[in-house]
A protein has these predicted regions:
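Alpha-helical cap/lid subdomain in secreted, periplasmic
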Residues: 61, 80-163
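Structural motif
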Residues: 72-81
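Residues at the C-termini of beta-strands that transition into short coil/loop
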Residues: 69-71, 138
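Bacterial N-terminal signal peptides
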Residues: 8-17
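Serine-esterase "nucleophile elbow" of acetyl-processing enzymes
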Residues: 21-69, 84-88
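Bacterial N-terminal signal peptides that target proteins for export
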Residues: 1-9
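Second-shell loop/turn segments in exported
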Residues: 35-42, 71-72, 102-111
């Protein structure tokens, strides 16, 4: 797990490298599904908590103020139910990991998912003081799991999103 968060930590560190040492801690909100809310494990072991601890150990003053996520959430549910809560939290940094349930539960097309994810990104960036303070975490690669069929769909989606 540690290797998997090294790149996000590095990228996040670069985004905040110019932050003054005596500045107020960065207000961080994590948005997502069961991966984000740490279903089945303690919150301190969730990836948002681990990312926060890694950034703190790198000298970045940051506080994870809220994990806005739901078990089984799709991108549409996140748009409808989670996004209205974001504005009042006044985040300065947001991570987004969503999409697995779109594929598993809904089986949506990549074009429909692309529309939803772009809408989520726009809404998040509109609630941030700097649109560069959003870290988008991709859907996990299922190619090494029993759900290999989903892995092929995810890979195709990611390639389309990168276009």
């Amino acid at each position: 797990m540690l290797r998997r968060i090294t790149l996000p930590v590095f990228l996040t560190y670069l985004a905040f490298a110019a932050q003054s040492v005596d500045a107020n801690p960065i207000r961080y909100v994590a948005i997502g599904d069961s991966y984000t809310v740490a279903t089945g494990i303690e919150e301190k072991d969730s990836w948002p908590s681990q990312l926060t601890q890694k950034l703190k150990s790198a000298g970045i003053e940051i506080n994870l103020i809220e994990i806005l996520g739901m078990r089984g959430a799709t991108s549409q549910q996140t748009l409808n139910e989670v996004m209205p809560l974001l504005k009042n939290l006044e985040p300065e940094f947001v991570t987004l990991l969503i999409g697995v349930n779109d594929w598993i539960r809904e089986g949506i097309s990549s074009s429909k998912f692309k529309i939803r994810i772009k809408s989520l990104i726009d809404k998040i960036q509109n609630n941030l003081p700097s649109s560069r303070k959003l870290l988008l975490i991709t859907i996990p690669d299922f190619s090494c799991s029993p759900k290999k069929k989903i892995g092929a769909m995810v890979k195709a989606l990611l390639m389309e999103l990168l276009d």
